[in-house]
C-alpha cells in the first residue's frame, strides 16, 4: 500500500477563475449605475448582471463575484446604485435585496448547472434566482421596517416585476449565446 499522495494539480481559485469573478464584480458595479430612480428602490440593471454571473460562472463563482461586490460596497467603494457605498447602505431597510444578489447568483447558477444552459432553462433558473433574492430582501425589509411581509412584497417587489421579466429574458438570451463561446475559448 502506497502512502504517496496525488500531486497538486491546481487551485479552485485559479487566475482565470479570479479574473472572471472580478470581471463580473465590475459588471454588477457598472450595471448598478444604469438606474431609473424611484421612491422606494431604484430600478437598475444590477440584477441583469447578477443573472449573468450565476448563469455563466456557475454557483460558487457567481456567488463569489457578488460577495466581492458587497465587500467593496461595505468598505465604502461607490459600487452601488447612485455611486453609493458604505455599510449603512447594506444594513438599511432595502439592503436585504442587495445581499440577496449573492443568493440569486448562487441559485441561478445551481439550477443552470442542473438543468442546462438553453434559453428557456436559463429563464426558469433566473426566475427562481430572482424569487430567492426577493424573498430574502422582502423578509429583511419587513423585519427592519415593521411592515407585514405581504405589504412589503406589494410595495418593494410587485412594481418591479415587469422590468425583471425583461431583464431575465435579455440575460437568458445573452447567457445562452455567450456560454458556448466562452467555453470554446477556455474562459469558463
Give residue ranges: language-model regions:
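Interfacial aromatic-anchored transmembrane helix boundaries in multi-pass membrane proteins
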Residues: 32-42, 70-104
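Hydrophobic transmembrane alpha-helices
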Residues: 2-63
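Hydrophobic alpha-helical transmembrane segments
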Residues: 18-23, 48, 52, 62-68, ...
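Short helix-perturbing small/polar motifs within transmembrane alpha-helices
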Residues: 3-8, 23, 30, 87-135
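Generic alpha-helical transmembrane segments of integral inner-membrane proteins
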Residues: 22, 26, 30, 52, ...
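Alpha-helical transmembrane segments and their cytosolic interface
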Residues: 1-25, 155-188
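Membrane-helix interface segments
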Residues: 14, 59-64, 115-121, 148-149
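Interfacial helix-loop-helix junctions of multi-pass membrane proteins
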Residues: 77-83, 140-154
Amino acid at each position: 500500500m502506497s502512502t504517496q499522495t496525488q500531486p497538486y494539480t491546481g487551485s479552485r481559485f485559479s487566475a482565470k477563475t479570479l479574473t472572471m469573478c472580478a470581471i463580473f464584480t465590475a459588471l454588477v458595479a457598472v450595471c448598478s449605475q444604469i438606474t431609473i430612480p424611484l421612491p422606494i428602490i431604484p430600478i437598475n440593471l444590477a440584477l441583469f448582471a447578477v443573472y449573468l454571473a450565476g448563469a455563466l460562472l456557475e454557483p460558487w463563482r457567481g456567488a463569489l463575484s457578488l460577495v466581492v461586490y458587497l465587500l467593496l460596497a461595505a468598505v465604502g467603494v461607490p459600487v452601488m446604485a447612485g455611486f453609493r457605498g458604505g455599510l449603512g447602505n447594506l444594513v438599511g431597510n432595502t439592503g436585504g435585496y442587495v445581499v440577496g444578489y449573492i443568493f440569486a447568483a448562487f441559485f441561478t447558477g445551481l439550477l443552470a448547472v442542473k438543468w442546462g444552459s438553453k434559453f428557456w432553462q436559463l429563464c426558469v433558473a433566473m426566475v427562481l434566482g430572482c424569487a430567492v433574492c426577493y424573498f430574502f430582501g422582502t423578509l429583511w425589509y419587513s423585519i427592519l421596517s415593521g411592515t407585514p411581509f405581504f405589504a412589503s412584497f406589494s410595495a418593494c417587489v410587485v412594481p418591479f416585476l415587469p422590468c425583471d421579466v425583461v431583464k431575465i429574458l435579455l440575460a437568458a438570451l445573452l447567457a445562452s449565446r455567450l456560454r458556448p463561446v466562452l467555453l470554446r475559448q477556455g474562459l469558463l
